[in-house]
Amino acid sequence: MSIEVKNLIKAFGKNTVIDDISFKVDNGEILAIVGFSGSGKSTVLKLISGLIEKDGGEIITTGDIAMVFQYSALIDSLNVFDNIPFALRERIDLRKKYAKEQVKNIVKEKLAMVGLSGIEKKFPSELSGGMQKRVSFARAIVTEPEIILYDEPTAGLDPMSSTLIENYIVRLKQETNAASIVVTHQMSTIMRTADKVLMLYGGKPVFFGTPDELCKQETPYTKQFVSADLEGPMKMIKE
């Protein structure tokens, strides 16, 4: 077990945004957390990563946690080579562990794992959105984490780039054996990457199961999410 969440609760003022959520993710598994906008998906990742504090429940993790942010969060003033080992320089325990030549080899290894060998000297502005995302993957795995959190990893990407990113999420799971959580609203990402799916609605769990089971659900929330139908419990503002 790498992640276990028990009865998780988070509120902002009087607004409870995460309401009694529980799940487990083992090593080598990918859990997709899905739902409509505002359902609390990204808040769960922020709670697990420690970016915000919970108001109730337990979060039990084993090993280092890495976060891949929605918009890559690369440092524009640094080239790829300097972006990737950022955690190795900032964490005192890791700074003392690796010599300069070792860091260089680690960067090359991680870039190769995401299919980007040879771009060390390029700056983020010189890369496509998909390439920036893959660099952020390389940065995430530089500390050999046991847990990888992906926040909307295909946001803003074209369909082919999205497929490539989805394939690398699965590949990194296989190569690192990390427990992974992918927050997404894309059915393609769910079907290509996830072993299990947790669906939230209004901060509450309304489904937990496999991607195939999600597609067969007839409950109003899950059915509308899968079909992208405008008719259902989730109402869109019409122009």
Predicted regions and their residues:
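Conserved catalytic motifs of ABC-family nucleotide-binding domains
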Residues: 144
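Conserved ABC ATPase "signature" region
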Residues: 98-118
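Catalytic Walker B motif of ABC-type/P-loop ATPase nucleotide-binding domains
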Residues: 148-151
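The feature captures the beta-strand-to-loop junction immediately N-terminal to the Walker
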Residues: 34-36
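Conserved ABC ATPase signature
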Residues: 123-127, 131
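Helix-to-loop junction immediately C-terminal to a conserved catalytic motif
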Residues: 49
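A short, surface-exposed alpha-helical micro-motif characterized by mixed small hydrophobic
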Residues: 190-192
